[in-house]
Amino acid sequence: PVGAGASDLRNETLRTLLREVRFAAIKGNSSEIRFLAGEKATARGVDADQGVLVSEDNLVASARMAAELSADTGAVVIVSGRIDIVAHAQKAWAVSNGDPLMTRITGSGCMTAVVVGCCVGAAPTELPQACLCATCAMGVAGEVASENMAAVGGGTGTYRSMLLDAMSTLDGPAITCRAKVKYIL
């Protein structure tokens, strides 16, 4: 739901899609997901409102909101941010992988959505696990890219390339070893 809450056209299109399509997964930033959940949310284009970002202080409340949207839509709901939330039915997990540089490049959220789609397609009968794996994979790739960039120097262009490289060389054991997942609900 890129830019949900940012314009009337996007909002009406999203409402129509939610009525007419059964999604396996819905991924968005905190503003986008709050809008879809019917909560007051403001967005600046595709960027989340800084006042509603998921934090340790609002983690449980944010997880409940995502879990309720999941129960309403039947989809796994992924809230992306410094702390990601993956919710399905009345369960939710926090994923604390990633790197602050991910917020400084355009498209990291869209990259995550692509990884979610790939994992959902690969494991359609295990949707919560697929979405958790995708979310962890993207975060771990972000961490690896940051570590690799620190070794050679560079800026956000270098980071973007190293993020793609990290994702292309990531494997299951690396994700399992580095995943930072906490059960919330």
Regions found by a protein language model. Name each.
Residues 1-6, 166, 170:
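Glycine-rich nucleotide/cofactor/substrate-binding loop typically near the N-terminus or early
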Residues 2-7, 85, 102:
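Short, small-residue-enriched loops and turns at beta-alpha junctions
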Residues 7-11, 30, 59-63, 110, ...:
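Electropositive phosphate-/nucleotide-binding environments in soluble metabolic enzymes
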Residues 10-92:
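Conserved phosphate/ATP/ADP-binding segment of small-molecule kinases
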Residues 65-70, 127-141, 160-167:
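Short, well-structured alpha-helical segments that form the helix of a local strand-helix-strand
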Residues 95-106:
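Short pre-catalytic strand/loop immediately N-terminal to key active-site residues, enriched for Gly-Thr
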Residues 104-136:
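Short, small-residue alpha-helix embedded
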Residues 140-185:
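Charged C-terminal helix
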